[in-house]
Amino acid sequence: MQPFLCANWRQDHSATRCLGAGTKGCTGCHLVMYCGKDCQTAHWPVHKLDCKNPMRKAAWRPAWEVENRVPHFIDNSDEEHTPVAMHGGSKYLWGNVPAFDLLQLKDNEGEDYSRDLSLLLAASGDLRNLVKTIVSLPGSYRGRIHIDINDRDETVVARNLVFLLVAFHLPPDVASVAILHLWYSAFLPESLLQSVRGAVFPAISEFLAADPVQAASVLQKMWSCRSSTLSAALSRTEWDRVLSYLPEAPDISYEKAAALHESITLAHSRRDYRDRALFPLHPSWRLSLWKFRSDGILLPFGASREDFRVPNPTLFHNEHPWPMPDSADPLQGWTLTEILRPSYGAKHDLYGQLYVSLKRNLHSFCERLHTLKLSICLFKQDAMDLPDKLATLRGRETFYDRIELANIADLGYLGPAKTLALFGPLLKARNENPKATLIMLFLNATREMSTPADQLASMPRAMETLQRFLPMRPRHGDPKNKYNAEFLNQMSAADLFTDNDTLFNRLVERARFRDMGRLLGLGMKIHNSIVAKWPLRLGDNPTQHEFEMAFWSGHTGCERYVEWHRVG
């Protein structure tokens, strides 16, 4: 990993930019690094605006408290500030639960296992689970892995294909940085975008020119990278749309794109929602989050942004508005405690830590594409149609060692019965692989099963426990104010202490999980072996640090995984 450059640079170009390595962190905020005392002193007039920012003070309070009013996420008397669940676009281009290794060979087939494997990601969203799985493979693995990746969203599929083509066609040190910024940064350096376009555009346009088929006809194209292959089966129209995500010139100016981005991520009408998210965080984390929301560029806090002037065409597509809700956050797709492992000196630079972690993982992922035997196939289908479409395309059914279904089994989507009936038959038989596993995620089940009586019954215990972790601080704010930030903080954290097992068991009984499984020759695992049943839930007798990691992650602890295996 290359060292980070000294943070002594200025946006107005009024000073010469230091090209030395950043080795000395600011001890005030731990957000930036310098090559030495001279540069730190020279940069202080600029850095003090961040280091002394009121948001970094322990006494900082949200605007609704300072202005002594009802927060906008509660008040519905003003049309502009009517509480809504979402502001911004409706696409989910960044994961909202942490990535996990789909194989976990050590705890399943065994660390020395080297037979071929087949994986299905039926509603993949982004590529985080693929990346996590590939980088977690034991170095001794010698088999071939076949991976089918599907999503119904055009933008998700196009971005995933572009990222993988970059990994196949550019050296790992270049590809890893390019994928990172295409994935998470609103703006890119011109040189990076041209490298990507030069690698990806001809790979698609040349084969389309040689095969002029009708718009609805499915075209399959395969690329090779040493012993790995990448293919996609898309209609001609869908292939053309992939190319539209890499235009020769930007569809939109930097100024207009920045305004569109800020209209979602920094909307005035949503300031109370932002303050509610910022308030619980470590003071320097607040500023790291604010900077990312402000400029939309995933870099260390002190890194220069001056080259990042081209709108990311996979996010600003055909002059469309910012495609994601204002709650979208790259951090939610990764495990916070893994991101925060010591990696560089600016220890409170939260998004800088994420940058370091992602760059390392993506570099490893790109390297392993060159050494493993992988065959990756991309599809754009509704999950409900996917099994039939795959069988038609291949002329046979494909059976899998792992089937990952995201949360399509939630009641608001396909539901558990239909999901299991569609994908359960695709799991390999016990005599082929007794460890074959189908993985369902339920994000909304406990909320859907909870009644007002449940909520009333659980609140006293939750609030009593929370006094230990989130005590009211009478020196800051008015504790008698029912909209006191500490009190609302406690209410937000109460989900972490809810009896979710009881609520989820209601769904298991009402939806007749066991009966469904029995009909299909499947059973729910008593002990999950791929991903913990409640991976984001607090354990018994948590420490203050464990509570803070869970609360600051932005997750509720209600996320429940169910693993199914062949029985009988």
Please identify what each model-predicted range represents.
Residues 1-29:
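Cys/His-rich Zn2+-binding "zinc-finger" mini-domains, especially FYVE domains
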Residues 2, 46-120, 124-568:
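Domain-level detector for long C-terminal conserved domains
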Residues 5, 25, 34-35, 50:
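The −1 position to Zn-ligating cysteines in a subset of zinc-ribbon hairpins
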Residues 29-48:
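Cys/His-coordinated zinc-finger cores
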